[in-house]
Amino acid sequence: MSPESKKITAHGSTSMPLSRTSKPQKFTIPLTVGAIFSVIGFLQRFFLASGKGDVQSLYTLSTMFILGAGPTYAGADYFICGRLFSFVPSAAPMSPIRVVRTFITFDVLAEVCVWTGAGLLAGAHTDTAARYKIGLNLIRAAMITQAFLFTSFVAILASFHVRVCALRAEWSVTSNGGTGRRFMMVVHSLYASSIFIIIRSAYHIAGHSFRTNEQPFLICEASLMLLNTAMFNVFHPGHILPIDSRVYVGIDGQERANETIEGAFTDSRPLLQKILDPLDVKGLFSRDKKRWHDPTAELEMDINSTLYAALT
């Protein structure tokens, strides 16, 4: 059995717990679909290597599903990040709804480019060299877009990490600050997943330009996606973050429920500002750094006053 086919079996066995270990949440769907895409893609490539079926059809399908798995996994990371931001809203650098909406939009565009480019690339021998070039450029554009998205994503996640560290200094000391949930494990998992996908995008950018033998790239692809799938099965966000999206951590580190918490993250900016600055980059610099806000406004506190009271 080839290395790729061995990883197919592993992918299938690790993807199933994603959909049954906890109540399904939004991020569970793309995690499972991404694993299924990987399995389908490598199965098609296995049949191609075995000389079974139509060569062109198998190559086209395998390329589309293998390359399409990455953006699908990325979508899961964006949903997990949004859920994390809504759980600790006081440390969120921007609205979780805004983060998910913006990244998912560009992720869908990358997925479309991958599938279109793979189709053109696979059937290029029946047409002109121009078709091959267009398909190759579409795949490159998709991989570059995904690498840029995850670089930005890591920067936003790092900003959240820094804010959480500052906030937890004010919480009562427990195993994880004021809440018993190991939500920082979700942050670390997102860091790892981002690194996997950035590496994957980088070698696909190089691979479609310079490779002469695709086996090392397929093994690397399967290994990274297998690690990503296994990691989220071991550290499943659905087991760490509360299922009820109305539950959040207040500025005192205690969990509470808020019936209107989803409304606290609606984008109330003018339409033109939403279009020109969908990620609310301006908000990163104009936000009042002196105050942390509880969504219910019941526990709003001035950090400087708190520090002064603690010192006196």
UniProtKB/Swiss-Prot annotation:
Keyword Membrane appears in the UniProt entry: yes
Cellular component GO terms held in the UniProt record: membrane
Entry keywords, A to Z: Glycoprotein, Membrane, Transmembrane, Transmembrane helix
Composition bias, Polar residues: 11-21
Induction (UniProt): Expression seems not to be induced during iron deprivation.
InterPro entries hit by this protein: RTA1
Region (Disordered): 1-21
This protein's pathway: Siderophore biosynthesis
Sugar-modified residues: N258, N304
Similarity comment text for this entry: Belongs to the lipid-translocating exporter (LTE) (TC 9.A.26.1) family.
The protein's name in its UniProt record: Lipid-translocating exporter-like protein RTA1
Organism listed in the record: Ajellomyces capsulatus
